[in-house]
Amino acid sequence: MPYQIHRYPAELIDVISLTYGERVVVRPVLPQDRELMVAFFHGLSADARCNRFMHPVSEPSSELLRQFTQVDYTSHVALVAEVFLDGRETVIGEARYVRAADASLAEVSLSVAELWQGKGLAKLMLTKLERHATAAGVRRLFSETLATNQKVLSLAVKAGFVIAESADKDGVMRLEKTLGPRNHIHRCADCGFVVDDGAGRS
């Protein structure tokens, strides 16, 4: 089936400031970001790739890159964080949610380059996804991660996720969060797509 995009959500484009004042562009991913995503994955350590996919991945497959860059923005919403290093556009983080068969439920995942961790980027991207998901009618987010992935588990606790052992997968933790009511999210002509009145904010 040919790739089709429902509507590119330009309102999700943002410039954010991290803990130490670094400015980062966050925007929805595009099909032409394929090579940027390849470079991003190559920059992750073997452990980081294993944590992201829950199994060893040495090289992203063509199918994986297709899934990561050809996003319809209806059932699948994906963001990249980028900076310019030595004059070159460089992806330093990615975050996404994919709706389940029950459209009120979505799986969320993210990864951040090691040199950019601990600066608040993961939390900012997760918050942006949560707000968009709430406005789109998603009621619950979930994710799975290895029990040894302390960075993600720590982020999940701070973001208000409930953590429990997976019922059917050894060494795997399941993370779940109920989002706030949709009526707490409204459009704002001056500041983009959504404003959070407080519900669902961790």
At which residue positions do the language-model features occur?
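Long, contiguous binding/interaction regions
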Residues: 1-202
